Amino acid sequence: MGLMWGLFSVIIASAAQLSLGFAASHLPPMTHLWDFIAALLAFGLDARILLLGLLGYLLSVFCWYKTLHKLALSKAYALLSMSYVLVWIASMVLPGWEGTFSLKALLGVACIMSGLMLIFLPTTKQRY
């Protein structure tokens, strides 16, 4: 059950990260504070996506809290690295994100996935 909550947390946090990235690229920069505030108060699509991203992070924290009650911290914390993989893949697949593929990034993803496999593979008891 803890693994399920952890995966929910990772998926929701990844979607929230993508939402915040979209909002940040479409809203005025915070260096133009009054324009930024005006865009938030207009509550257009960009502001709503920003709010969804923030609410997504809040929901992700709730799922993470549930994860930590059911799963060892050493395993739970390793799950967070899945978010890097999901966001990288989504940035290449989703239109408008212009994520780039590189062998270096693929090697990083392979390292992350290998590490997760090592952590989550069942251990066998050795007999002496």
Swiss-Prot record:
One of its GO terms (biological process) is lipopolysaccharide biosynthetic process. Residues 1-2, 57-76, 122-128 are cytoplasmic. It is found in: Cell inner membrane. Residues 24-35, 98-100 are periplasmic. Keywords: Cell inner membrane, Cell membrane, Lipid A biosynthesis, Lipid biosynthesis, Lipid metabolism, Lipopolysaccharide biosynthesis, Membrane, Transmembrane, Transmembrane helix, Transport. Gene3D superfamilies: 1.10.3730.20. Pathway: Bacterial outer membrane biogenesis; lipopolysaccharide biosynthesis. It is a multi-pass membrane protein. The chain crosses the membrane at residues 3-23, 36-56, 77-97, 101-121. GO terms for cellular component: plasma membrane. One of its GO terms (molecular function) is carbohydrate derivative transmembrane transporter activity. NCBIfam families: PRK02971.1-2 (NF002816). Translocates 4-amino-4-deoxy-L-arabinose-phosphoundecaprenol (alpha-L-Ara4N-phosphoundecaprenol) from the cytoplasmic to the periplasmic side of the inner membrane. Belongs to the ArnF family. Heterodimer of ArnE and ArnF. This is Probable 4-amino-4-deoxy-L-arabinose-phosphoundecaprenol flippase subunit ArnF. It comes from Escherichia coli O127:H6 (strain E2348/69 / EPEC). The gene is arnF.
